Design a protein with these regions (language model features):
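Arg/Lys-rich, positively charged N-terminal/basic patches that mediate binding to nucleic acids
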Residues: 1-39
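Conserved protein kinase catalytic domain
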Residues: 22, 41-44, 89-92
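Generic structural signal for secondary-structure transition and capping sites
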Residues: 30, 45, 49-53, 75, ...
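Amphipathic, hydrophobic secondary-structure cores in small proteins
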Residues: 32-37, 41-43, 47-50, 61, ...
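Basic/aromatic recognition patch in beta-strand/loop cores that engages polyanionic ligands
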Residues: 54-83
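Enriched for short, Lys/Arg-rich terminal
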Residues: 72-102
């Protein structure tokens, strides 16, 4: 029995996050940037099959808005689930003060 697959949509700001991260890494290590991009894409595919895989944030403000996040290396993919669609809101380095960016 196959699971129902969810659609994954990156919001514009998440697309910008992704592009900035990959460009930053590529400036010094192009092969590492390519590997990172592939890892993000694979994790998004995984989310499409298991949307509740990510954790609920400990920050009450984000949890109350039904955000979840998935850790990929040092980065956090923040997303929400609405019906059969996963909306990726941000892709941020875990050391950032990410709460101020929502």
């Amino acid at each position: 029995m196959s699971r129902r697959k969810y659609n994954v949509r990156l919001l514009r700001v998440a697309e910008d996050d992704f592009t900035e991260i990959v460009s930053y890494i590529a400036a010094d290590r192009p092969s590492a940037a390519e590997a990172f991009a592939t890892k993000i894409e694979k994790n998004l595919q995984l989310l499409s099959r298991s949307p509740r895989l990510g954790r609920v944030p400990k920050e009450e403000e984000l949890a109350r808005l039904h955000y979840r996040y998935l850790v990929v290396e040092n980065y956090l993919i923040f997303y929400t689930i609405e019906g059969q669609t996963i909306y990726v809101h941000r892709i941020l380095h875990g050391a950032r003060d990410y709460l101020s960016l929502f």
